[in-house]
Amino acid sequence: DNIVSSNALYGGTFTQFNDILPTLGIQVRFVDAEDPSNFAAAADENTRAFFCESCSNPALQICDLEVISKSAHDLGLPLIVDSTFSTPYLCRPFDHGADIVVSSLTKWVGGHGVCLGG
């Protein structure tokens, strides 16, 4: 199985996708999200999801969630969006076609790595 992901990711997410998921048999195909058509071009019959950050950390790349979600849905795939950096106040990915939205409470409770939240 594989997922197609933007290559503009928070470092911890990139490490998880690049180093940890392959040990579990999950391949991650990194694409340049500046061109949303790259997601569908990288997908195949073993692709299970598309992943991106609404606003990437630290590059500040903004993904076109509506176009990427349409590409995902045309292939019967979910779009997973990490919206930690933009916060739910500034961006609501569900309103733009995302199927799963994740956000790190740890970033907003303290921001210094002294607390932990999901």
Please place each PLM-identified region on the residue numbering.
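Conserved PLP-enzyme active-site core in the AAT-like
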Residues: 1-117
